[in-house]
């Protein structure tokens, strides 16, 4: 078996003529794929991420395993689903996995220099960023690690609190983990993401002669929406921002558990504030995109383009007013789907429509770099998609939040709430209803489809909890 694993890894590497490539893992925070121009956005232009997409494989059906920061990051870094490691909060996966190697640690154990800049495992934003603390980071994963402190909502500039400020009693930005927009004074290095990009470029230059695994975590567009003034130019005046189409009585067929924790109603955001929120989010994305460009330029200037696998993604998606939902957590596509781009030197650019999970990154990158793929990992190796984007490794992607579970097939989305998914349900025909306006779960015509998903969900939950961790579920 060991010989077979080595042989498969060698085949993967030889196909591209690469020997022990570097890994540059870039992750954004709270980024919806729909905000990127390479995923079809016509308003928010992201030329640097687009550049990466034009050179790599862009996945159109990639899904996170937890629809908010803590579970998602603990999952893809540990190699286990959130419920397997009992992580639905904001902690480290280390207590659950013991001495088992995380994704970065696996590379470290195999001779790679592993470095982290800013948020890879969970960090509180903005609180942890303001303080420059480690959050739920895992020291054993890294050879060296760096935090990028920034002023966040306290950055000098013109700011407004949009959430729960209908009477405008809060004259400027107040509080952090809330919908605040700040058109900030000063240059990029005032902010956490500017510092992160600069440190990443510095580390690339320092370690260019030894294989490295570099994790670069940008905190934008996570709230507060803070970016240099120049990144707001394309989105002013905010009144020109377009809100998504909405239906009257849209929530009538959505279970209570399916109503997102942030809505236009409970945030008391009128149309003006909603449009400004979209503009502030896009400005934050534009800033983050420029910082991605700086890192990619630094890699090229170091002469490492031809020996580095680059991954770009987000920890989960984000609602920008769809169904009058905002932010993350929801199990609808806007929140559960993520952008994913993998640039592999020597391969032709492609677009892959197969279902993949962030959990697949650990085994896939291990294989592509010639490392043994631990058999305990719950993700799947998708490396063959680099040469054959039509290849499929799963019939459904799986994601969770604190209230329920998602099974996402090519043509269907099934959401089950409650303990073990035995509560209320949502069922959407994604071919006929891609924006998920009509819940078919109670329609007798779809009884067979619903029954199939109920059986499938029970099997998936059993699979998640069947592992080597020795935990009681």
Can you say where each PLM-predicted feature lies in the sequence?
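Residues forming the ATP-binding cleft of Hanks-type serine/threonine protein kinase domains
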Residues: 431
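Sec-dependent N-terminal signal peptides
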Residues: 3-14
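Formylglycine-dependent sulfatase
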Residues: 2, 16-419, 423-425, 434-455, ...
């Amino acid at each position: 078996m060991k010989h077979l694993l080595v042989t498969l890894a060698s085949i993967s590497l030889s196909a591209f003529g690469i020997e022990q490539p570097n890994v540059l893992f870039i992750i954004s925070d709270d980024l919806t794929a729909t905000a990127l121009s390479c995923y079809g956005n016509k308003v928010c232009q992201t030329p640097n991420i687009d550049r990466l997409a034009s050179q790599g494989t862009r996945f159109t059906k990639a899904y996170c395993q937890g629809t908010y920061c803590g579970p998602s990051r603990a999952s893809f870094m540990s190699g286990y689903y959130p419920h397997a490691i009992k992580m639905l909060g904001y902690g480290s996966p280390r207590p659950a996995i013991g001495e088992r190697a995380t994704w970065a640690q696996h590379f470290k154990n195999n001779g790679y220099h592993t470095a982290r800049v800013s948020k890879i495992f969970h960090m509180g934003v903005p609180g942890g960023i303001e303080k420059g603390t480690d959050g739920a980071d895992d020291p054993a994963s890294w050879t060296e690690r760096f935090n990028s402190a920034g002023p966040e909502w306290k950055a000098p500039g013109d700011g407004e609190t949009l959430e729960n400020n209908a009477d405008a009693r809060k004259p400027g930005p107040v509080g952090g983990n809330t919908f605040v927009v700040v058109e900030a004074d000063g240059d990029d290095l005032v902010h956490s993401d500017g510092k992160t990009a600069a440190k990443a470029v510095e580390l690339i230059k320092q370690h260019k002669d030894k294989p490295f695994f570099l994790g670069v975590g940008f905190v934008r567009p996570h709230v507060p929406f803070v970016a240099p003034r120049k990144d707001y130019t394309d989105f002013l005046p905010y009144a020109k921002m377009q809100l998504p189409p909405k239906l009257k009585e849209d929530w009538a067929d959505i279970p209570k558990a399916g109503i997102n924790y942030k809505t236009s109603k409970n945030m008391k955001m009128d149309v003006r504030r909603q449009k400004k929120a979209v503009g502030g989010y896009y400005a934050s994305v534009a800033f983050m995109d420029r910082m991605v460009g700086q890192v990619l330029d630094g890699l090229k200037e170091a002469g490492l383009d031809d020996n580095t696998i680059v991954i770009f993604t987000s920890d989960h998606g984000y609602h920008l007013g769809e169904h009058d939902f905002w932010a993350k957590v929801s199990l609808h596509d806007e929140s559960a789907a993520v952008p994913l781009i993998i640039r592999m030197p020597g391969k032709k650019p492609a677009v892959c429509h197969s279902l993949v999970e962030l959990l697949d990154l650990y085994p896939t990158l291990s294989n592509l770099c010639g490392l043994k793929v631990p058999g305990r990992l719950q993700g799947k190796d998708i490396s063959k998609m680099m040469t054959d984007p039509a290849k499929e490794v799963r019939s459904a992607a799986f994601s969770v939040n604190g209230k329920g579970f998602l099974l996402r097939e090519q043509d269907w989305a099934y959401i089950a709430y409650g303990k073990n998914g035995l509560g209320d349900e949502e069922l959407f025909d994604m071919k006929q209803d891609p924006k998920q306006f009509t819940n078919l779960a109670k329609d007798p015509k779809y009884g067979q489809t619903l029954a199939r998903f109920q059986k499938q969900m029970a099997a998936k939950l059993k699979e998640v909890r069947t592992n080597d961790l020795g935990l009681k579920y």
